[in-house]
Amino acid sequence: MSFMNPVDMVDEDAADLQFPKVALLHIFTTLNCLFAVEPLGPQVKRFIHAHQNEHTRNSMVLYNPHTLHRYLEEMEEKTRDQNSSVPSATKDANRCATCRCSLTEPYIKCSECLDTLLCLQCFSRGKEAFSHRNNHAYIIVRDNIQVFADEPHWTARDERILLKTLRTHGYGNWEAVSQALDQRHEPAEVRRHYHDCYFGGIFERLLNLKHARDSYVPERMPYVFKMRSLDPPRHDDIASMQFRLSAGYRCARGDFDTPYDTSAESLLSIMVDHRGRDDDNEASESEFEREVTEELQLGLVRAYNNRLRERQRRYKIMRQHGLIMPNRTVSWISKYVHAFGSDASCMRFLGFMQICPDPIKFDMLLESLRYYRELHSQLHKLYDLREHGVRTLSGAKLYARLSKERQQAQRDYSRLKQTDAFDWQQLVQHYESNRSGDPGPLAINSKLYVMNTRRKASPIEIGGGKHFTHCLTPTEYNFSLIPDLPGYSKLDDGERKLCSVARLVPQSYLDYKNQLVTEQAKLGYLRLADARRLIKIDVNKTRQIYDFLLEHGHISRPPSYG
């Protein structure tokens, strides 16, 4: 059917075009805006088109036959490509998963989601889509790389343009390929490159490819250990220390030599033994007795199944949370001990992992608790700074540095005060005149004894500029505990000073206090000997704790003390 002459379009003529009706309607609805700017020459004709529905309307359109013919050929090729055998799932294959823009190299491909593509802008902003997370491993897809080792001047972009141009222009049109490559390669070079790298199936042999997926995505191994690993697989060596530490775990079958609740099978053994005796007395039993016996046996089976389910539930928890390896488990637990204040509190909290099936969420919960603990300690440091009039972080650094210098100066002053009264010249003259080792004067010996005595342990102080402490008075220290110690926030000022002087951890002091107060509630009084019997620490520290609690009314002496 020719479009060079004016024709009146009817239903039969539209059917002869062999276009889909949707595409045909799209063509005719865009003719007005497309050809409105075309100059009207001597071949301008009239054209009438009809909509194929109950609201059919006729309109007069002016068109250029040459332009219309060219546009219809383009639409025919476009429609043929849309109706080709390309699956519908691949229509969005080259679009960004978040902003839906068309992708051009370079772009990002997720190596875990496999079908998620991102543009560089969305990737740099850390955007997520569907199951894709911004912490997944990724692959940079770019086409400015060299594909063939022997062709250093041909990039992947040039290879794609070459194949696409040959598909549209046909084999042998090397000039068109050279023009598509912006004359970067001569037609003879293009012909030589195609014959050397693509012709006759040599492409896969040059690149040593077996599957297109293997060039981007590594093969996934559905095993616990990698098949290509140089380390030997785990084996169940009964004599090894690792086997004993893992409670006899058999990795091949995923079970233990000594399973949990080893007496569960004894229920079935009791039933089997009883069943053997019942076979001998089966004739003498009544129907009621047989029903009762059967119900008892069913009850034993149900109890056995319940114990098996409990065993498998514990195995599942161990497998999900990775509790098989004892060394890793202990190191993992010790990582969060500080967040709970004590080992006992941490171990009690770990029992809640059985109600949290997702181990990642349980780890996130522990991390949040640890972060809460760190934030709590930081707030106490800021409270202490605010009490001393410090309002800025720069002032806090200056305060910590000056406080540390003041502590050191106070220690130096105390040490100097002990040695000022000693006459070094008198000591030197005595030893030079008396080399036989005779005892010196009483005053000199007493001073030497004072200098050589063991110094008392200094209180727990803040050092290194990392923590903050109170200002020191000229006569004594205003002691302060490290706020990071467990139980620090539960102490008042007097208890903090006691723990600092006695060098006690706040949580340990609270435990000792609870023991003594509990014993006081039982007996109505508390002796110092009873306190030393309950608290197995230094007797001097026990005396300090006892006197402190007695002074503040937490405990009382027996009536015989007067």
Curated annotation (Swiss-Prot):
Domain spans labelled SANT: 154-198
Occurrences of domain SWIRM (ranges): 471-562
InterPro entries (UniProt xref): ADA2-like_ZZ (IPR041983), Ada2/TADA2 (IPR016827), Homeodomain-like_sf (IPR009057), SANT/Myb (IPR001005), SWIRM (IPR007526), TADA2A_B-like_dom (IPR055141), WH-like_DNA-bd_sf (IPR036388), Znf_ZZ (IPR000433)
Keyword Manganese: no
One annotated GO molecular function: transcription coactivator activity
Places the protein is found: Nucleus; Chromosome
Residues the entry annotates as binding Zn(2+) 1: 96, 99, 119, 122
Gene Ontology BP, a term: regulation of transcription by RNA polymerase II
Record keywords, A-Z: Chromosome, DNA-binding, Metal-binding, Nucleus, Transcription, Transcription regulation, Zinc, Zinc-finger
Pfam families (UniProt xref): Myb_DNA-binding, SWIRM, TADA2A-like_3rd, ZZ_ADA2
Binding site residues for Zn(2+) 2: 110, 113, 132, 136
Upregulation: Under heat shock conditions, strongly down-regulated in L2 stage larvae with levels remaining low during the L3 and pupal stages. In second instar larvae, down-regulated 1 hr after starvation and then appears to return to normal expression levels 4 hr after nutritional starvation.
GO cellular component terms, A-Z: ATAC complex; euchromatin; nucleus; SAGA-type complex
Inactivation phenotype: Late-larval lethal.
ZnF ZZ-type: positions: 91-146
Keyword DNA-binding applies: yes
Subunit structure: Component of the Ada2a-containing (ATAC) complex composed of at least Ada2a, Atac1, Hcf, Ada3, Gcn5, Mocs2B, Charac-14, Atac3, Atac2, NC2beta and wds. Component of a complex that does not include Gcn5 or Ada3.
Task performed by this protein: May be part of several different complexes, including Gcn5-independent complexes involved in RNA polymerase II-dependent transcription.
Additional record remark: This protein is produced by a bicistronic gene which also produces the Polr2D/Rpb4 protein by alternative splicing.
Stated name of the protein: Transcriptional adapter 2A
Gene name of this polypeptide: Ada2a
